[in-house]
Amino acid sequence: QVRKAVWEKLSLAEVHRDLISSAKPRIMFFREIASRLSSRGVAVSAGDLNLYSLQLTVQRYIVSRYLEQQCPDILPNLLDAAGISPGSTSLEKFAGTFCRLFPGTEFIEDPTLDPVSWIKADGDRLKLLVSEILILSVAASNKALESFREVIDWNGLLLESSAQEVVEGVESFLTAAPPVAEFGLTLPEILRLPLKAAPLSLFEQLKFMKEQWRQLLPEELLPEIMAAFTLSEEEGRMFMPHGDHEHTAAVLEFGGHTAGSGTNDYYPEPERFSSDTDWMPNVVLLAKMVYVWLGQLSKKYDLEITRLDQIPDAELDLLAEWGVTGLWLIGLWERSPASQHIKQICGNPEAISSAYSLFDYAIAADLGGEEALWRFKEKALKRGIRLASDMVPNHTGLYSKWIIEHPDWFVQLDYPPYPAYRFTGVDLSSNPDISLHIEDGYWERRDAAVVFKHYDHRDGRTRYIYHGNDGSSTPWNDTAQLNYLIPEVREAVIGTILHVARMFPIIRFDAAMTLAKKHYQRLWFPQPGHGGIASRPEHGMTRSEFDAAMPEEFWRQVVDKIATDAPDTLLLAEAFWLMEGYFVRTLGMHRVYNSAFMNMLKLEENAKYRQTIRNVLEFNPQVLQ
């Protein structure tokens, strides 16, 4: 129901052809319309366009069902009453006018197509014409469409006196016709009910249709409706300032889920604890940002200390005296230079790359490399201090070894998910084989895009790769999100973890909760009707589809592999979102972050923390051991 003038003004035929040929999700068509209208000063929501499109689908189904199932013999009398009986000149005139002003895609692709011949070629097309007349008549009084009235305005049609008579004839006949059996109301009344229930909200109108007409709608339409709700809500979140909502900590509870209730996110929770070896219960772990620590030691000892093997024995003696038995060195690995470049361009000239934006799992050369690590490790172990290291499984740095060698290993699209995205800034790649550009909004501090542009000079392919993201704030714009639905990715990450385990007896997994199956699906391949990272709902999966692609919990695979190949390794997971019990009891991590304690201490919610401890003890005291 897009006017021909709008098709032409916004060059939508080209957009539509691209959509069909590239199999892009339908929402991309509406994002293009919204973007092109917005560039002309008309603020339009792609989510609203999508909601209205689904409304049209529902309305067409209701009208078609009425004409074909309840009143299959009514059409000839209806056409006569409207003055457009088959074979009449009035039908030819009206059909020509209607298809000229509101052409279907058939007429856009083939402007020479004759409307009358097209309608005569298939008897059902007369029903479709009646349906469109009635639906446009309903739309004319829908105040929720005002933001994009230009797209569907039918005043041009009503200027034709004969067209006005046709519309009035259709409305008048159907008002006097038998009511829709299930509701006892006429067809025009039924179609206007959502407008009365929610005059100004397309979201609420479609919600009304879903809830009140549920028994009439085909089952396959419901996931599309739920997805439309999700996309609309996603748009609302995109324009809501972060931190504007009230933060609170939830009490940790157990046994509240049953399979098949609500969202299908229930996963079995068998008891599969991992046993500690003799030294693990006595670990007292001290964290040090390695570059900061070396700088502090340089001042303390009045020495130039830049390498791990230059750390004075006296400092290790002091740590041992304090009772430290584990030293977590943050920032050992080779970092992605793109991270530093982004920070410096954004106004922090002294910044270094993030410790969680990595190029590769090699000890940084300026720290002395692996050779210096082994010497320092030996000295520390003589004092009963084991070394710990981060492992960042969720993502790599924006510029990384895998981005160069395995660009297909990342969550990505062949097109930008939002048409307004532009990638014209500095190339952040240090390798001539590829170019990397983050979205211009980061440089201009006006947007936080979910993807960056990866151009491969070797084959000419452009990818739009998602930044790492846990959905709680803005994307991490110096990172690239790994795709764990790819078996080779899971195998490669497990291999990297074993590499780390050969060097460090204690491993701390960064953002481990993001890779639990329920959360990885929620974020990147959400179930129909549920949101995740912006633009990902249109790439969602059912639970069964996701389970087929990722049959096992990744962390259970990791724990089992470590148990056989590196059994004397202590595994520590950063697992928030009330996942502590699951990570320890079912996935087999030795230790896990106590996010409940951290958040409740900060918010001074002592009663909640006491209740959390009680709940854990009642469920399984071993979780706390």
Q: What do these predicted ranges mean?
A:
Residues 1-305, 364-377, 382-383, 397-625:
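Alpha-amylase-like alpha-glycosidases and glucanotransferases acting on alpha-linked glucans and related
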Residues 324, 358, 386-388, 479, ...:
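Extracellular structured ligand-interaction cores
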Residues 334-387:
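Aromatic-lined substrate-binding rim segments of carbohydrate-active enzymes
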Residues 328-330, 388-392, 510-512, 572-574:
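A cross-family glycoside hydrolase active-site/sugar-binding cleft signature
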Residues 311-345, 499-508:
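Catalytic domains of carbohydrate-active enzymes, especially glycoside hydrolases
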Residues 334-335, 394-395, 578:
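Solvent-exposed loop/turn segments at secondary-structure junctions
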